[in-house]
Structure formats: C-alpha cells, structure tokens
Amino acid sequence: MALGAIGDGRLLLLLVGLLSASGPSPTLAIHVYTPREVYGTVGSHVTLSCSFWSSEWISEDISYTWHFQAEGSRDSISIFHYGKGQPYIDDVGSFKERMEWVGNPRRKDGSIVIHNLDYTDNGTFTCDVKNPPDIVGKSSQVTLYVLEKVPTRYGVVLGSIIGGVLLLVALLVAVVYLVRFCWLRRQAVLQRRLSAMEKGKLQRSAKDASKRSRQPPVLYAMLDHSRSAKAAAEKKSKGAPGEARKDKK
C-alpha cells in the first residue's frame, strides 16, 4: 500500500512537470514595433505606424488597439480598435473626425493616420496587438510632437555634413587624377617629340657619315691629278734649258 502511494505520487509529479513544460513559452510572445517619436506640423497629417512579429499564422481574430495619453496627463484613453475584420474609431477624444485606418492585418500592419494636427495632439500613442493564440506580449509606444515647423533632426544635419565632406573628397580625388592624367599625357607628347628629334639627328648623322665615306676617293683622285700635273711641270721645266741650248747652236 505504501509503495503504491509513493508510486502514485511520483506519477502525479511527472504529470505536473509535463503540463508545465507544455505551457506557453516566453520566446513565443508577440512583439510589437512602432517608431520612438514622430514629428508633425499644425494643420498637416502624420502616420503612426505599428507592426508586429508573431510565431503564429495571422489569425482571423487578430486585433489592434490604439491608446492615447495626452502630454502632461496621467490618463490614457482608447481611440481606435480593429477586430473581426472591421476598424472602429472611438467617440472619446478629438480624433473621431480626424483619424483614418491605413493598416493591413495580412501584412502585419496596424498603422493609422491623424489629419489636421493640433497642439492638443502632443502626447504618447500606444499600439497593442493580439494574434490568438499568441496574445502574450508587450505593447509599443510612439511619441507625437506637433510643432509650427518640423525641426531639422540631428541625424539629418550630421548626414548632410558627412555627405558634403565625402563630396569634397571625391572632387579632390577627381582633380588629382585629372592633373595627373594631363601631366602624364604631356610627358608622353614630349617623349614622342624627343624621340622624333633623336631619330632625325641619327638620320642626319648617318647621311653625313655616308657623305664622308664617299669623299676620300675624290680627294685621292684630286691629289693624284695634282701630283701628275706637278710632275709634268717639273719635266717641262727640266727639258726647257736643253732646247734652249740647241737653239743657240
């Protein structure tokens, strides 16, 4: 009897452990995403986007709920609800005539648009999504700032500065490459001219050498001719006295 009771107790503990292990896992909780802050100007419109991630398929019973907490207020009111395939705009608050549903549940999009913004719209908007059976999760909040003029964000200014610096660097690099290209091209032209001049000098020197190689025979012929003429003159001068003697006799 005692052994049977102990065995039944162990079986009960085992069943409890299995049931607890098969319970909902925190890793399967739904995750909702919205931007941290959104800016708008008085009289314009703004889109408050809301998306989510779920481990389950998109359910027919999916629901979106938007709440609004005005700046400086502790109370939060429901301003919009989507369920059973139909959007509902709550009568509470000043958004009834200025709100538009632009979401698409099949694309996990629960965005809304608020038209004709006013300073009273400053505050925090909360988006909550349920996708049965995935209903455990944390909602997401976005803060709306309504101003006379949309301020230039720090990121935009920084991006503009970085873009300007990169553009300046690109221009400097382009100028350097252009100057280098022009310099190399000029050097190539000068090199071709020098090569042509050197080639012309070589050709002229070759012609001069060929002329000089042809001059020695002519000089030798002129020397031989001058020698022959000199010898003939000497013979003539030697023979002239003898003829003179014959004439005297």
UniProtKB/Swiss-Prot annotation:
Alphabetical GO biological process terms: cell aggregation; cell-cell adhesion via plasma-membrane adhesion molecules; myelination
Intervals, Extracellular compartment: 30-153
Membrane-spanning intervals of the chain: 154-179
UniProt entry keywords in alphabetical sequence: Cell membrane, Disulfide bond, Glycoprotein, Immunoglobulin domain, Membrane, Phosphoprotein, Signal, Transmembrane, Transmembrane helix
Alphabetized SMART domains for the sequence: IG (SM00409), IGv (SM00406)
Pfam family, one: V-set
Glycosylation, residue list: 122
Signal peptide from the UniProt entry: 1-29
Chain residue ranges for the region called Disordered: 227-249
Database matches in InterPro entries: Ig-like_dom (IPR007110), Ig-like_dom_sf (IPR036179), Ig-like_fold (IPR013783), Ig_sub (IPR003599), Ig_V-set (IPR013106), Myelin_P0-rel (IPR000920), Myelin_P0_CS (IPR019738), Myelin_P0_Ig-like (IPR047014)
Span of domain Ig-like V-type: 30-143
Membrane topology designation: Single-pass type I membrane protein
Residue ranges that the UniProt entry lists as topological domain Cytoplasmic: 180-249
Disulfide bridge map: 50-127
Compartments, as annotated in UniProt: Cell membrane
Family to which this protein belongs: Belongs to the myelin P0 protein family.
Function: Is an adhesion molecule necessary for normal myelination in the peripheral nervous system. It mediates adhesion between adjacent myelin wraps and ultimately drives myelin compaction.
Protein name: Myelin protein P0
Organism field: Gallus gallus (Chicken)
Gene name, Swiss-Prot/TrEMBL: MPZ
